[in-house]
Regions:
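Active-site Tyr-X1-5-Lys
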Residues: 123-126, 137-160
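N-terminal Rossmann/SDR dinucleotide-binding element
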Residues: 1-71, 80
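SDR active-site strand-loop-helix element
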Residues: 6, 30, 72-76, 112-118, ...
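Conserved Rossmann-fold NAD(P)-dependent oxidoreductase catalytic core, especially the SDR/UDP-sugar
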Residues: 74, 100-141
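Short beta->alpha connector loops of Rossmann-like oxidoreductase domains
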Residues: 36-37, 79-83, 121-123, 168
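Short alpha-helical oligomerization interface
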Residues: 81-98, 130-137
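Conserved cofactor-binding/catalytic machinery of classical short-chain dehydrogenase/reductase
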Residues: 58, 90, 97-101, 111, ...
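Conserved beta-loop-beta element that borders a ligand/cofactor-binding pocket
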Residues: 112, 116-117, 150-172
Length: 172
């Protein structure tokens, strides 16, 4: 099984790539290496790993990579509200437009697994945990791009979205 992971050198991506390789998947990582990450260095010699330095907004790269995979896991993003607010156009292009581009190159048999940040939930009700059924009320550009990307991907069959939420207890 061939899997394309965009943003595969990022925090979640690098952990996921290692797990996929351990389970004998062929993995292609597309990452811009914006922060010069070294997270995949220890996996460089794995014959099942192919690393492409490139931009998820580059139609030529996407057109070349997508037909070679069975599953796409789009993790590439400008992450976090502060970064997205200071670079709104780039946030829209990377977090949202690249998802539309990716979707346009998929066949009906290819699957997509899309995790969505807890930023999609916005501010929840005090004392209540978010669930898959909780309303999505993003309060930041980052959250809005992630929610919209989910709706774009979920318009097609063979797609799964995982809404990720965290619960932090404060010491104070």
């Amino acid at each position: 099984m061939n899997i394309l992971v965009t943003g595969g050198a990022g925090y979640i991506g690098s952990v996921l790539v290692e797990i996929l390789l351990r389970n004998n998947f062929n993995v292609t990582v597309l990452d811009s290496f914006l922060y010069k990450q070294k997270s995949l260095d220890k996996l460089n010699n794995d014959p099942c790993l192919k690393i492409i330095k490139g931009d998820v907004r580059d139609e030529k790269i996407i057109k070349d990579l997508v037909p070679k995979c069975d599953i796409v896991i789009p993790l590439a993003a400008l992450v976090g509200a502060p970064l997205c607010e200071t670079r709104p156009q780039e946030a829209k292009e990377v977090n949202l437009d690249s998802i539309s581009l990716l979707k346009s190159k998929l066949t009906k048999n290819q699957r997509v697994i899309l995790p969505v940040s807890n930023s999609g939930y916005g501010i929840g009700k005090p004392g209540e945990f978010c669930t898959e059924e909780s309303p999505l009320n993003p309060i930041s550009l980052y959250g809005r791009t992630k929610v919209k990307s989910e709706s774009i991907i979920m318009e097609r069959d063979n797609s799964v979205s995982f809404r990720l939420a965290t619960d932090r207890k404060s010491v104070v």
